[in-house]
Amino acid sequence: MSIEVVEVRPHELHYGVYVVRFEDGTERLATRNLTPGRRVYGERLIKWEGVEYREWNPYRSKLAAAILNGLKLVPIREGTHMLYLGAASGTTPSHISDIVGERGLIYSVEFSPRVFREFMEKLVDQGRRNVIPILGDARFPYQYAHYIKGVDVVYIDVAQPAQAKILADNADYFLKPGGYVMLVIKAMSIDVTAPATETFKQEINTLKERGFDVLETVHLEPYDTAHAMVIARK
């Protein structure tokens, strides 16, 4: 038996993000579905006052986890142009696609051909025209530079060492002046022997050395262990 929705309201801080309240008192994040009737990863579809929303699962999306853990700055609006490194099968990019809308663009880079095909099937083939898929290696931005114009935000979520360096290298190519970067630090992908907090500091220092002002850092427990989200600007 489904639980009835009693309210959908805009998030008090974040554009394009909504809070759904159910009759049992629980609340969930959601975004307004850009492609009504279609799911991306099995998420619940919620209809309220003639509008369809997609539940945003923080255990499947590190951006949702960061928002629930108190992230104050999400530099994504309607019309934002973004480079997303490590698009995987498209869970978080799909919600960003909802937020940026038809005037926005998400250049989505994924390295694995198998995962890239899944991304295509779940997002591009389902009518998300604001998503530009790129099969490529985020370590080598020159390989896909001819596909991308300047972007407002560079977002990275890759299981590689030197995550901050990869982000900064891409920002040098594509980030507009005054633009933002969003770094998901996966500590265990960088150094399994070091405490996660030390790895976070190391990656943040790399951003600072590359000329970024670090604005906010949020740890992602309990949704993801040894992960953090960093927002910075150049």
Curated annotation (Swiss-Prot):
Q: PROSITE patterns annotated for this entry?
A: FIBRILLARIN (PS00566)
Name the residues that bind S-adenosyl-L-methionine: 91-92, 110-111, 137-138, 157-160
Name the SMART domains on file: Fibrillarin
Highest taxon of source: Archaea
Q: What class of enzyme is it?
A: transferase
Report if keyword tRNA-binding is assigned.
no
InterPro entries from the entry?
Fibrillarin, Fibrillarin_CS, SAM-dependent_MTases_sf
- Keywords, comma-separated and alphabetical: Methyltransferase, RNA-binding, rRNA processing, Transferase, tRNA processing
Family statement: Belongs to the methyltransferase superfamily. Fibrillarin family.
Q: How does it assemble?
A: Interacts with nop5. Component of box C/D small ribonucleoprotein (sRNP) particles that contain rpl7ae, FlpA and nop5, plus a guide RNA.
Under HAMAP family, the record lists: RNA_methyltransf_FlpA
* PANTHER family (alphabetical): FIBRILLARIN, RRNA 2-O-METHYLTRANSFERASE FIBRILLARIN
| Official protein name in the record | Fibrillarin-like rRNA/tRNA 2'-O-methyltransferase
Question: What species is given as this protein's source?
Answer: Pyrobaculum calidifontis (strain DSM 21063 / JCM 11548 / VA1)
